[in-house]
Amino acid sequence: MSANNMRLLCLLLACYISAIVAHRPSYRSSGSDRYVDVVRASETAEAQAAALTNAAGAAASAAKLDGADWYALNRYGWEQGRPLLAKPYGPLDNLYAAALPPRSFVAEIDPVFKKSHYGGAYGGKSVTLNTGAKVAVAALN
């Protein structure tokens, strides 16, 4: 073997050993009550998948809620005797993601409650409410 190949082999061996030593859990106890959490790859992968699922659900739900007509939703709630008191807080991505229970999603917004691109008289909102609609927003767990 040439000297360069030997140096390369030693360098790779040193990197390999340092990687093994760095990721090995330490079970020594030095006077204090210390413990080591052993992280399993399956638990980490499941937690990452759950976080991605929750984030995707929150983003999709926020996009659906951003397209809702809040005035129509509140008026429908008052007509049914159960005020919703929904308020538009601007883009709901961060706000809704923070308040969203894990793995909950807004299933569908009734087309009646979607924003209209056409305004009423003098640019006001024109809302036509179909009181036969039974569900405005449905949350799944």
Swiss-Prot record:
Keyword match Signal:
yes
The answer to whether the entry has keyword rRNA-binding is: no
The signal peptide here is 1-22
Q: What is its main location?
A: secreted
Localized where?
A: Secreted
User: Which keywords fit this entry according to its UniProt record?
Assistant: Secreted, Signal
Q: Which GO terms describe its cellular component?
A: egg chorion; extracellular region
Q: Which InterPro entries match?
A: Chorion_S16
Query: Which family, according to UniProt?
Result: Belongs to the chorion protein S16 family.
Q: What does this protein do?
A: Chorion membrane (egg shell) protein; plays a role in protecting the egg from the environment.
Q: Tell me the protein's name.
A: Chorion protein S16
- Per the UniProt record, the source organism is Drosophila subobscura
